[in-house]
């Protein structure tokens, strides 16, 4: 009887130790998560997450912003910025992460020991990180952020749309075990899209002055999908680059000037239309020229909500008669 009693006590102690010991991360018990993506060349591929990533390398400001919005900022161990002026703000958000303003080479990325790499397409070129397929083959999940390139020629890549931004947010929510947070962000986007304001039909131009060239953002990019959703039309051309003469004939009611960088770069971009050659343009003559950051209309991720609000506000301002 004594032996039975002591055996019983020993079993109770064992169960108690198990119950009081460190609890396993529930994320390790989940089934593999698979999301659709594509490689550097536009070929479809699946990215599998066997567990919630704990050491994430993010290449691109909007990717960082999206993961922070999902509540997964603490999983970011390093970030490479597309917009260097955000470094101070993002470093404050991610005090334990390494922040880079120049692309990483393959060896430097390997040294960071990431278990997941999220990045704009250009970072997966052979002279930088290498294609996502090579990382996946090594057992490291790698994902090209939706609609992050190539711009402006899509080639075989999926269209850059509102839906593609929502898909990116949803996929990151799945991968990081933050489905509810992703759904909350998407719900806010949907609510903004369903808002009742009546926007007058009008023609709109998105244009960037870059290194002596004039680039038009066409219908196959995110800005085109947003403008269509709001019942307006986007001025578009067969080629992304147009001549000064073609711009001088533009009859758009609103012109969005695309710029990279901060306040100084914004003012330089706006000054391009101060040229007397453009003073007759309807948008210029009526003061309907608006700055918009490149990052607001190319792969904005969770910042899509702010982009929608800003563009809608501009479309509602001083409607054409």
Regions found by a protein language model. Give the residues of each.
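Bacterial Sec-exported substrate-binding components of ABC uptake systems
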Residues: 3-4, 18-65, 174-207, 259, ...
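Bacterial N-terminal signal peptides
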Residues: 7-16
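Structured C-terminal subdomain patch of bacterial secreted/periplasmic proteins
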Residues: 35, 159-169, 174, 183, ...
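Short helix-initiation/N-cap motifs at beta->coil->alpha
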Residues: 38-43, 95-107, 238-245
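Second-shell loop/turn segments in exported
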Residues: 53, 118-122, 152-159, 170-180, ...
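A short, structured surface patch at a secondary-structure boundary
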Residues: 55-112, 116, 120-124
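Alpha-helical, coiled-coil/dimerization segments enriched in small aliphatic residues
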Residues: 82-89, 95, 215-241
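Extracytoplasmic ligand-binding site segments that recognize negatively charged/polar headgroups
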Residues: 124-130, 140-171, 202-222, 266
């Amino acid at each position: 009887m004594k032996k039975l009693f002591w055996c019983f006590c020993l079993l109770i102690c064992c169960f108690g130790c198990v119950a009081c010991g460190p609890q396993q991360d529930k994320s390790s018990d989940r089934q593999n998560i698979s999301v659709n993506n594509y490689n550097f060349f536009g070929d479809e591929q699946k990215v599998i997450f066997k567990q919630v990533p704990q050491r994430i390398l993010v290449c691109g400001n909007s990717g960082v912003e999206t993961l922070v919005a999902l509540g997964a900022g603490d999983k970011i161990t390093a970030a490479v910025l597309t917009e260097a002026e955000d470094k101070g703000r993002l470093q404050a958000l991610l005090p334990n992460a390494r922040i880079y303003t120049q692309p990483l080479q393959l060896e430097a990325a390997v040294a960071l020991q990431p278990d997941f790499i999220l990045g704009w397409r250009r970072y997966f070129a052979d002279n930088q990180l290498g294609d996502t397929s090579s990382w996946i083959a090594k057992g490291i999940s790698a994902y090209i952020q939706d609609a992050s390139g190539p711009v402006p020629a899509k080639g075989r890549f999926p269209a850059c749309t509102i839906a593609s931004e929502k898909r990116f947010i949803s996929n990151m929510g799945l991968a990081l075990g933050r489905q509810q947070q992703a759904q909350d962000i998407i719900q806010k986007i949907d609510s903004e899209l369903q808002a009742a304001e009546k926007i007058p039909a009008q023609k709109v131009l998105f244009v960037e002055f870059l290194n002596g060239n004039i680039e038009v953002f066409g219908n196959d990019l995110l800005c085109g999908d947003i403008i269509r959703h709001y019942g307006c039309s986007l001025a578009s051309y067969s080629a992304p680059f147009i001549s000064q003469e073609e711009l001088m004939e533009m009859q758009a009611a609103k012109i969005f000037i695309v710029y990279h960088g901060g306040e100084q770069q914004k003012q330089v971009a706006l000054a391009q239309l101060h040229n007397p050659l453009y003073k007759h343009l309807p948008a210029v003559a009526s003061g309907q020229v608006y700055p918009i950051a490149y990052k607001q209309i190319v792969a904005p991720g969770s910042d899509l909500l702010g982009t929608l609000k800003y563009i809608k506000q501009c479309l509602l301002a001083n409607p054409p008669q």
